[in-house]
């Protein structure tokens, strides 16, 4: 696939990758969700692995190619209040506080802008204000937090101190109903977008939770012979190289969603290993499959420190699979830089594209 994708007046240009596999420091361990900070930096929640390695939140500066920088990390593994077991969603409040959902504890932990623990709220259960395996979280313009209460198939709105404000949704496949919802995003008007994981769609709701639109339909990419992967969600049939061939409008367990200022909608199509792009009316535009042909700065540092890694890398007959997404889980759009940032979970990296607003195609004189 080309490094630049042009469709209906929009161009999406691959920029660079960030990351490497690492249980701490400059890298990721199954990055699961992300959010933008108030200064345009990025917070990444790492799921970690079954050996309790790598659970944490990274605070990073993205910038352009080679400009990435690790600013801090916190919410590491443990049972204390300042720790997380299964960090899932992450959001930044108006005052810079960072909110992290813990799927295992069914709580929300709050940290200040420097990563210092402030407080924790949330009680396991299925009653009003209780949580069961909370997933995505997002901060409204009012300062309230919308939590994707995944295990209870609903959304709940809380004050920054954890007081319940409202809730909507229930289990099901109808309008405004959910089946293991995952990621969440808001548009500039405060409308809510939810990645409805097991219903294979994204739902758009009004700021008060009224159903407005369903985006996407269920479908799988063609599966290659004997293609198989094991993720932290269990065994999963996988076919990374064929992701490019599937129609743009189908979704297979979508996990993350973002909306840009033009209203275009970006969906992490987890099961199909790609990023699907829709217009503001929910019509499919195109999809991206990952184009990391250039090693990330942090990855290159690992190779420079271990020449045997480069020897092994150069023996690979076809590197194309390494360029592509493998179970992408999250996406954010930075309106200040027009960057589309995708959490390429199984590759332990972020892939960065840029939406080009002034793109002019090459004109040949014939």
Where on the chain are the PLM-derived regions?
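Eukaryotic scaffold repeat domains enriched in small/polar residues
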Residues: 1-366
């Amino acid at each position: 696939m080309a490094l630049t994708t042009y469709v209906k007046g929009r161009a999406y240009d691959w920029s660079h990758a960030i990351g490497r596999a690492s249980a701490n420091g400059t890298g990721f361990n199954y990055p699961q969700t992300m959010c933008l900070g108030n200064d345009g930096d990025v917070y990444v929640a790492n799921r970690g692995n079954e050996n309790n390695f790598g659970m944490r939140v990274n605070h990073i500066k993205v910038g352009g190619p080679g400009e990435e920088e690790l600013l801090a990390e916190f919410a590491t593994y443990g049972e204390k209040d300042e720790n997380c077991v299964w960090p899932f969603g992450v959001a930044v409040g108006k005052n810079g506080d960072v909110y992290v959902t813990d799927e295992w504890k069914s709580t929300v932990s709050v940290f200040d802008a420097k990563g210092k623990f402030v407080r924790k709220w949330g009680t396991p259960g299925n009653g009003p204000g209780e949580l069961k395996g909370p997933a995505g979280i997002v901060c409204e313009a009012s300062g309230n937090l919308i939590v994707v209460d995944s295990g209870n198939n609903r959304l709940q709105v809380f004050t920054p101190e954890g007081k319940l404000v409202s809730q909507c949704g229930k289990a099901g496949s109808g309008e405004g109903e959910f089946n293991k919802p995952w990621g969440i995003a808001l548009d500039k008007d405060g409308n809510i977008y939810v990645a409805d994981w097991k219903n294979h769609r994204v739902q758009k709701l009004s700021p008060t939770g009224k159903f407005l639109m369903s985006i996407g339909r269920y479908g799988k990419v063609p599966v290659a012979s004997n293609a198989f992967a094991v993720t932290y969600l269990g065994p999963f049939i996988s076919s990374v190289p064929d992701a490019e061939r599937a129609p743009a409008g189908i979704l297979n367990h979508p996990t993350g969603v973002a909306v840009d200022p033009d209203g275009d909608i970006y969906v992490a199509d987890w099961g199909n290993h790609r990023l699907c792009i829709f217009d503001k009316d929910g019509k499919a535009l195109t999809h991206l499959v990952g184009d990391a042909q250039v090693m990330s700065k942090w990855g290159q540092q690992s190779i420079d420190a271990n020449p045997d890694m480069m020897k092994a890398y150069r023996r690979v007959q076809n590197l194309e699979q390494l360029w592509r997404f493998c179970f992408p889980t999250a996406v954010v759009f930075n309106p200040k830089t027009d960057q589309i940032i995708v959490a390429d979970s199984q590759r332990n990296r972020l892939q960065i594209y840029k939406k080009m607003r002034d793109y002019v195609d090459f004109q040949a004189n014939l």
